[in-house]
Amino acid sequence: MKAAIIGLGVEGKKASASFLQHDWQVYATDLNNKVDLSDFEIPLVEIDLIQDDDNISMITGSLTVDLGFFNSDEIDSSDVVAISPSMWGSAIAQKYLEEGKLLCDVLTAHKDIFTIGITGTNGKTTTVHMLKEILEESGKKVLVGGNAGGGFEGYYDLILKANSEDYDILLVEVCDMTLEFCDYFFNFDLLALTNIGNDHMDVHKTIANYKNKLMNFFKGKEIVLAHNQDFQSDFRGVASKSIPYYEFQGDLKIWGNVNKLNAGLATAIATYLKIPKNIIKDVLSNFEPVQGRLNVYKLNDSLIYIGKTDNVDATLSILNEKNFYATFIGTPRANEYHRLEIIDEIAKYHPEVVVLFSGLDDTIDMAVERFKELQYDGRIEIANTLDDIIFLLAEFSHEEAIFIGGNGQNTIIEIQERLKLLSDNCNNSY
């Protein structure tokens, strides 16, 4: 079969890779002629390349890529058209929906699997992994995935896998920017909300708009909400059933009140699915932090709290629990001004030292300027490399606590990996 991929952002690239892995012919296109194709990992000797000033065409094996233009004949001759979730609601998405060419309308086995969606601003990935481990320990075969930008292989990969093997449960992490897309592509039996926070405001514009999108998503479905969730009456009013969850009361290896809530949500869903209490308790008490998410390492006299906190609410959830001598913050993309609110809160918190490193983009100058505008008078350091970060951590490692967060999941994972080596070598694992 043949798939046409329109748009080569993170989701489009991963969709292309997934289709190829399932032995499909793939036509991939993007109007941006500067898309980085290195993610496809194709040896240059195997590529037929045609290039002019504005357009690039590449053919290799089962893959054809056009950049700067698209070939209508290639798209129309495809069995399936895969659009970026960000294109949902556009005229082109509507066209292929009406033609029945969207993947979820061609391959439909995934719609027969009991499907759980986890959405919200923070805590989705940790909750998904907690629940996955509980379900697998109880003997269920679980397929897990979600938004490609969140570290998974993408929504299309989920559908392809669900149509090639048998599973008991489909567990989907749903990005708050893809609610309408996922509502059409998946048949959710249960939806859960971790929380509502101030993120992706460049898309939602206001919390009220985000709330309204969630109400549409929850309409007619069974939902799981925190017992004190904002807008609870609105959500309950549109849902067919609402189940509350509370903080987990047992012991956890992972730190923080936010993780007690994540564990509480996983517990509520597992209880709904009639998983025995002893399995839930045993799995959660031994649950290890997800890569890139909040973890704690000991280095000399200091405890280092590190994890992606790419919005102001995630950052505050950490700052409100501990007194940190230094905070290391990864910077956002140049156009993500709403994420600079993280800096506003760091300035109010006023640690002795702020260390800035490039997270998603080299926007350190923008961050420094924001600190100056806020009249932060502590010490500001710039870390241009991983070695710079480790050097500064060593300098501060006799203080009680250090926080590393902000934007840039891949960079934060690299720091975690280096910290673990240092911590293990010092025989000081937390």
Regions found by a protein language model. Name each.
Residues 10, 122-126, 260:
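Residue-level detector of alpha-helix initiation sites
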Residues 3, 81, 115-116, 142, ...:
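Conserved hydrophobic helix-helix packing surfaces used for dimerization/oligomerization
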Residues 1-35, 42-50, 77, 271, ...:
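ATP-dependent carboxylate-amine ligase
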Residues 30-34, 70, 82-92, 176-178, ...:
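Short, polar loop motifs at secondary-structure junctions
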Residues 19, 81, 118, 173, ...:
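Residue-level signal for inorganic ion chemistry
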Residues 72-76, 85-222, 232-237:
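Phosphate-binding loop of NTP-binding sites
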Residues 1-117:
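Short, basic phosphate-binding NTP loop
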Residues 19-20, 184-198, 255-289:
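A conserved, hydrophobic alpha-helical segment in the catalytic core
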